[in-house]
Amino acid sequence: MELKTMPQNGANNGNPQGNTSNNNNTNDSSNSNSNNNNKTERTNWSNGLEFLMSCISVSVGLGNIWRFPFTAYENGGGAFLIPYIIVLFMIGKPMYYLEMIMGQFTSQGTVKIWSICPSFLGVGYGQAFGTICIISYYSSLLALTLYYLAVSFQADLPWSTCRDTWINCVNSRPAEYIETMMTNGSSALTRATDTPAKLQSSSELYFLDVVINEKTDISDGVGNPDWKLTIALFVSWIVIFLVIMRGVKSSGKAAYFLALFPYVVLFTLLGRAVTLEGAVDGIIFFLEPQWGELLNPTVWKEAVVQCFFSLAVGSGPIIMFSSYNRFDHPIYRDAMIVTTLDTLTSLLGGITIFAILGNLAHNLKVENIRDVVRSGTGLAFISYPDAISKFNAVPQLFSALFFFMLFVLGIGSIVALQSTIVTIICDQFKWKYWKVALVTSICGFLMGLVYVTPGGQWILTLVDFYGGTYVVFILAIFELVGIAWIYGVSNFCDDIEFMSNKRVSLYWRACWLIFTPIMMIVIFIYSMVTITPIKYSDIYFPVAGDVAGWLLFAIGASQFPLWGWWYVHNHRTGSIAKSFVDSLKPSQKWGPADPETRRNWLLFKSDLAAKRAVQAKSDKMGFFRQKLYNMCGRST
């Protein structure tokens, strides 16, 4: 995006009105300006709308159109929807708003924000590891999308009709549902009533047999990369590199297109999907609540993970984007807009997919929509193409538009994730941005090769489950604990009040302090205790696969204690115990980056501490009220 360099400004913070606070984060206030002798300048967005559109482009992406439908499909449709909405309000929105605040308040990236609690430095590096895992397989989805985009320009969509070698195949093309291709290559008109084997649509068989050449067993290896998908993967990474090589300076104007164009295609597909026969049954399956599933912890765990993926929480892009805001930018408004629009987009994608699944169930004579197609990451590459093949007018055009849209969404998601990694590296080593972008893009391409093999979908499922799910989940818990429980909600809310000149509502305080961390901890512990061996398409992974998955999780999660130990060991202030306690306190680098804003902030915090100390002494119940305040951040 087009940026302009300027010093950051505070927000009417000379004498802001507000509550009083225990100033436990200013243990180094006497030396607060030692690191700020020179005026710090920070590039800012040229306008707030570009920031908003950029957040929409990363949050409203593959997580909504690709991951949400198959996650809902695997968890019972309406059985998943209710927990997802609850999780959104109790976990998703609070975490999203918190990360926006952290980035804007400090003007720092995912790792350097942990000057707030230095021993939690490993949270930032662990999240970077989880982000790398996500990037590795997201790029393979771009390769699949690019492949489908290329074949969409053929005279006939290649997945719309059955091939001679496909048994029990039903054409996806309209008016040909009952034409089943037999093993001898002859075509016969049959009715599904007497067919003993399960019928499969031509779009599903095309994806499994032609595009990914799926292996049903990886005990002997995953196979060699497919040359067509390898080329598509290479082209995808070239595009990614070209976008990120100049950082955020050139992507602002594109954010308008990246954020708005997908809705045109989505509404077009929705309009066609809801008019198909059986679509109502699919939509009802998606929207009808199944209250009994509220007691299923697996559904809650999947709702949390999907919320993180959809909003890009716990992986760094939100912190990175908001770090380029002016200090007084109204992020509360933007956080509410993005999280609400993200949910509506997920519902839009879900209704579209399940309308198509309802139509497939009708055509394949299947009573249970869960049995229509195999679940998994390929669902979007089966259901959407099947719907497009039913367009009466120029389906090739709609196919090209849809997969171009999916490619754009993928680029928006990966660019944000990849930029997070590049920013972390550049912040640490001060290397040239384009060189880091080039090297990381090459590494991303090499990692992505494993996903374009016949066993690639197995690896994708494994990495998504252990690296993209549990690593992100547990580190998000540590992130919230470090900010809300160790730094303290009261201190955090004081910082927000200083930045926005507004008091923080009880809803946010209660979520950050109680509801969000407790819900996340309970769901995570229960999901770990009741975890079952991972499967792909109802087939269990070999033992080596499970071992590799747990090793992946261990590498990501271990970043937290390892970097914590490193910080304590290298910043000894006495005994190990004293050094550990000191490592839980904010360092001298914590606070606003602009020196003038930082001085005002320190005066603001000091004034609050003095006022609260006076109140505590003058009130017999002051001591207990102060303790209560420190817990929940409410005014005494």
From Swiss-Prot:
Membrane-crossing residues? 51-71, 78-98, 131-151, 225-245, 254-274, 303-323, 337-357, 397-417, 436-456, 469-489, 511-531, 547-567
- The keyword Transmembrane helix is assigned to this record: yes
Biological-process GO terms, alphabetical? amino acid import across plasma membrane; D-amino acid transport; neutral amino acid transport; sodium ion transport
> According to Swiss-Prot or TrEMBL, what is its membrane topology?
Multi-pass membrane protein
Would the keyword RNA-binding turn up in this protein's UniProt record? Answer: no
- Show the ranges annotated as biased composition (Low complexity): 7-40
Keywords associated with the record = Amino-acid transport, Glycoprotein, Ion transport, Membrane, Sodium, Sodium transport, Symport, Transmembrane, Transmembrane helix, Transport
Glycan-carrying positions = 184
Pfam entry (one): SNF
Which residues point to the Cytoplasmic side? Answer: 1-50
PROSITE patterns hit by this protein: NA_NEUROTRAN_SYMP_1, NA_NEUROTRAN_SYMP_3
What main location does UniProt list?
membrane
Subcellular location as annotated: Membrane
Where is the region Disordered? 1-40
CC annotations in GO? plasma membrane
Q: Which GO terms describe its molecular function?
A: amino acid:sodium symporter activity; D-amino acid transmembrane transporter activity; L-amino acid transmembrane transporter activity; neutral L-amino acid transmembrane transporter activity
In UniProt terms, what function does this protein have?
Unusual broad substrate spectrum amino acid:sodium cotransporter that promotes absorption of the D isomers of essential amino acids. Neutral amino acids are the preferred substrates, especially methionine and phenylalanine.
Q: Cross-referenced PANTHER family, in alphabetical order?
A: SODIUM-DEPENDENT NUTRIENT AMINO ACID TRANSPORTER 1-RELATED, SODIUM/CHLORIDE DEPENDENT TRANSPORTER
Q: Which family does it belong to?
A: Belongs to the sodium:neurotransmitter symporter (SNF) (TC 2.A.22) family.
The name of this protein is Sodium-dependent nutrient amino acid transporter 1
Per the UniProt record, the source organism is Drosophila grimshawi (Hawaiian fruit fly)
